[in-house]
Amino acid sequence: MNNETKFTPKDLDEELVKAKMLERMHDVIETAISKGFSAREALEIMTREIHLIRDEVLLHNKKAHNNIVCRELGVDDSAVIPQRQYLCALMRGSRH
């Protein structure tokens, strides 16, 4: 695992700030008003875009957790790890 990829968990709020979500929400509202969208349509657009970022953060954090476990167990990411062993290693590794 000398060439392992390091994953640092991400925070959803920080990622929303990086994506300038408040500015994007403002743009969505302006567009909704000018094009006659309903409030529900505008909300659905904003929710969909927030969920895309949330899903990216969740996937990244799952990879980060897997990286922690593999590092803790001294294996690469192709190892087959039983759930109980995975959770124990994750708990130990996340305390470091």
UniProtKB/Swiss-Prot annotation:
Induction entry: Expressed in the early phase of the viral replicative cycle. Expression of early genes is repressed by viral Repc (latency) and favored by viral Ner protein.
Alphabetical UniProt keywords: Early protein, Host cytoplasm
GO cellular component, one term: host cell cytoplasm
Protein location: Host cytoplasm
Main location: host cell
Record-stated family: Belongs to the mulikevirus gp14 protein family.
Protein name stated in the entry: Uncharacterized protein gp14
Organism: Escherichia phage D108
